[in-house]
């Protein structure tokens, strides 16, 4: 509203995590290794109300009582992969366990996103992690190229509202004119 009232058009405000769909915390109840599936285990999980079956190749990481992130059918991973109900032989997977990378919260790709014992079940993982990253989409006019960065928007808000503006700080690897490899 402040930017709009000062003549800058805010086209949209959105939370990219909410666009992903239903990604919730679930507890693994049972892990079963069927003889007719080589690299996959069948996990029975609950969100505290309902029960789901999930097939996963992370067989060395899953165990009973572990709380993990489940992307339900119809949701998307942070890498834009749509999660669907899948059937392998006679087994049906009702979602997908996510790594921190697939959930969009870190670069770790080779492990499941797990939570501490006692974490509420059936809640959005982003709510549990207290993550909310609203994104402003601002229409920039040709004469206001200084607003093309987050720092430029912060400087503008500093001028309009007299809010404190912290100076930009760079790590030692960016000081002194070093060139990136």
Protein language model features and the residues they cover:
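Phosphate-backbone binding interfaces of nucleic-acid-interacting proteins
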Residues: 1-174
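Short, intrinsically disordered, charge-balanced linker/junction segments flanking boundaries
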Residues: 177-181
């Amino acid at each position: 509203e402040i930017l709009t009232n000062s003549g800058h058009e805010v086209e949209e405000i959105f939370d990219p995590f909410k666009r992903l769909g239903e990604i919730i915390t679930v507890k693994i109840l049972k892990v079963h290794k069927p003889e007719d599936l080589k690299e996959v285990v069948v996990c029975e999980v609950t969100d505290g109300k309902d029960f789901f079956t999930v097939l996963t190749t992370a067989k060395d990481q899953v165990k009973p009582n572990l709380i993990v992130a489940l992307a339900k059918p119809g949701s998307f991973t942070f890498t834009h992969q749509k999660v669907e109900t899948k059937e392998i032989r006679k087994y049906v997977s009702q979602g997908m366990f996510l790594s921190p990378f697939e959930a969009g919260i870190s670069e770790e790709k080779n492990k499941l996103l797990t939570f501490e014992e006692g974490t509420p079940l059936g809640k959005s993982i982003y709510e549990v992690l207290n993550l909310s990253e609203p994104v402003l989409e601002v229409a920039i006019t040709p004469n206001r190229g200084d607003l093309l960065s987050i720092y430029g928007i912060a400087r503008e808000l500093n001028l309009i509202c007299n809010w404190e503006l912290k100076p930009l700080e760079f790590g030692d690897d960016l000081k002194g004119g070093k060139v990136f490899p």
